[in-house]
Structures are given as C-alpha cells and as structure tokens.
Amino acid sequence: SHPMIARALSTLLAACALLATQAQGTYQIAVMKYNGGGDWYANPTAVPNLVKFCNDQLGMDINPDVPNVDVGSPDIFTYPWLDVTGHGNITFSPQEAENLRNYLIGGGFLHVSDNYGIDKFLRPAMKTVFPELDFVELPFAHPVYHQKFDFPHGLPKIHYHDGLPAQGFGLIWQGRLVCFYDYQCDLGDGWEDHDVHNDPPEKHIAALQMGA
C-alpha cells in the first residue's frame, strides 16, 4: 500500500542521511526538544561537557557545537545521537512519533537521562513511538557497560533520587539497542559543570566515562 511504501522510503532515507553524516568524519550530538511542558532544556552544560570529554580523552571527532532539534523535524536525521532529559511531561504528536520511529529504525540512537520525575511520562510517550516494544532492563554483561570504560556493575549511581539502585533500560529493535534510558542514576546531572550540583569529582568522572 502507499502508506507502507512511504514509510519504507522514509526509513531508507533516514538511514542514508545518517550514513552520509557519519561518512563526513565529524559526529554531532543534539539535544531533542519535545512538547508537553517538560523541561527538555535542563542540564545545558551536560552534553557539551560529554563531547569535550570524548574529544579530549578518547580522541573522538565530535563537533563541539550541540544544537537543539525538534523531535518532529527532519533535521534529527542529521545527528546519529539525540539526548533527552527533563523532569516533567513528554508528549509526541502522531507525526513526531513517526518521525522519531523512522529515525531510530534508520540507524539513529536516543539516550534518555532521568532527571528525576521523567519516568511516568517517558514510558507512555515512547509507547506511541514503538507500541510493540517495552523497556527492558539491560544486564550488567550488556556491551553498553563495557566500551572504552568498563562498568562491571552497570550504571554508576550519580544522584540519590529515591535511593533506589541505578538501572539501565533499553528499547531493542530487531536486535539493536535504539534507546538507552538511565533511571535513578542521572548521568546528565553528572555531566554538568561542577558548580551546578557540586558533585564529587569521582561522580563527575564516572558519569562522563559511562557516557563516553
């Protein structure tokens, strides 16, 4: 049917756009803007600090400019990684949900950092993107914890929140992790400038290492 062909073409174009961006040799991370009233703009120093850490410590070629991009915009296909945070409500229109789905199916990646309070809004919002998927807790043996820096016990605990253990959840599409969600952890706060939260240096470094 025409809608199925259109969706297939959209996914193909998304994959091509991401591959073209990656072939240029300079990656760029963006902060994803969403509707619903939640503070998508929280932690303004977080992602720039992560980018600087990756470039300085790992020699990665990430563009230091971190733009904000609307979830419903075709511009999201320019960025291989989108970062999301906030404390409050998240809503996606049908067009926004389809756009984000095509982005993720086409090769994009979404990181969500629980800035304390986002959980009850994030889960139903992502259900509009992937109705067929549920967030699953990733085991400590998952490769996400064993990249450039090793985290044998999973996510580091950065902020207290409810005093619960930090957990990493994922949405897995056809065997590929398309969304990683840090819960009761707050990596984003850990990436921020020291004078924002006054986190101990070891917490700041652990958060950056996990992000990298």
Region spans (language model):
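Bacterial N-terminal signal peptides
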Residues: 7-20
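Loop/turn elements at helix/coil->beta-strand transitions in domains of secreted/extracellular proteins
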Residues: 25-27, 77-82, 105-110, 133, ...
